[in-house]
Amino acid sequence: MSLVPLVPIGDTLAHIADERTAAEHREALAVLEDRLRAARAEVEAGWGPAYVDRVHKKGKLTARERLAMLIDPGTTPREVGTFVNHGDVFPGDQKSPGAGVVTAFARVEGRWCMVIANDNTVASGAWWPRTPEKIQRAQEMALRLRLPTIYLVDCSGLFLPEQSKSFPGARGAGHIFKMNSLLSAHGVPQLAGVFGDCIAGGGYMPII
C-alpha cells in the first residue's frame, strides 16, 4: 500500500469561524468521538468478560489477542467493518458485535496484509447474518490491493437459528469460497491458521 501525503486544502479555520464557534465545534466533536470510542469498545468486548474468560480457560487467545501477536511490533491494525450488526438484536435477545468476525489491514513481516479472524468471544466464532458479506468485502479489498490474506480460524459454523439469512442471495456464504478461488487465480497468497473449532463454513476456509 502506498503512502498518501496529506496536505492542507481550502481556508484555515481562522478564516471560516471565530474562536467561540470553533471551540463549540471542537466540544461537539469531542462528544461524538467519545461516543464512537465507547461503541468501538462495546464491539471489541464481544459477549463480555465472561466469554473472554471462557476462551482463556480453554487455553486459547481471543481473536484480537491473536491479531496483536501476529502484527509487526509497534504497528497498529486498521479494522474495517467494525460496526457491522452493531445495535441489531436477533431472536432470543442475541447480539453479534462486529458480525462475529474481525477484519483488519495489518503489517506482517513488513508487508500489508488483510487479516480475517473469527471472534471466538461471540458464539464461539459462529457466522451470523452479514458475516459472509463482511468477510467477502475484506476479500474484495485484498484482491483489489493484491494483499496477502490471513485467516485466523476458530469457528463453530453458522449460528443455526439465523442460518436462513446467511446462505441465500448474491452475497451468501457460498460466495466467500468464490472469492477464495479468485484470490488464488490472481496469485494473491492466502494462509490459514486453525486455533480451535473448524466446523461447517469455517472449516472450508483453510481447505480452499
Task: For the regions a language model picked out, list residue spans one by one.
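Terminal-region recognition feature
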Residues: 1-192, 196-197, 201-202, 208
